[in-house]
């Protein structure tokens, strides 16, 4: 189930150039933002969430930089859930199902899906009809 971002009391948006430093900045911003929201970094979902975020931003840099000069990271949280999204303007929407794991392609996405499903979360790829591209939305229980 996809949580509408507007229903979450905590939200933050970060737009970065699609370059390698974006991974570190997105992760550090997540740590600072979560801490500011009172979500301790020792929570069992946070380390996997940070790895998921790093993988998604890395994928945007590696596969979308030619089409997408920027990557946007969306952070959201409520009492019982954490939402992360990564948006780029590359038109390709990768599958987030068993084919990611079974074909061996998309190793980063296979890791993402293993972590998301292991935590009881959800992952959805949504097309962006306004500016093109897609967003990958991750929802994890807290």
Region locations from a protein language model:
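Solvent-exposed, flexible loop/coil residues
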Residues: 20, 55
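Conserved short strand/loop->alpha-helix "switch" segment adjacent to the catalytic nucleotide/phosphoryl-transfer site
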Residues: 32-54
């Amino acid at each position: 189930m996809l949580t509408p971002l507007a229903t979450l009391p905590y939200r933050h948006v970060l737009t970065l150039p699609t370059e390698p430093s974006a991974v570190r900045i997105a992760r550090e911003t997540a740590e600072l933002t979560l801490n500011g929201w009172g979500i301790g970094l020792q929570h069992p979902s946070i380390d996997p969430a940070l790895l998921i975020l790093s993988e998604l931003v890395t994928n945007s840099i590696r596969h979308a930089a030619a089409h997408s000069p920027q990557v946007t990271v969306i952070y959201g949280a409520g009492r019982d859930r954490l939402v992360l999204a990564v948006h780029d303007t590359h038109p390709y929407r990768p599958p987030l199902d068993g084919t990611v794991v079974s074909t061996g392609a998309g190793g980063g996405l296979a890791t993402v899906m293993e972590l998301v499903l292991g935590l009881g979360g959800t992952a959805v790829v949504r097309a962006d009809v306004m500016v093109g591209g897609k967003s990958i939305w991750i929802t994890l229980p807290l």
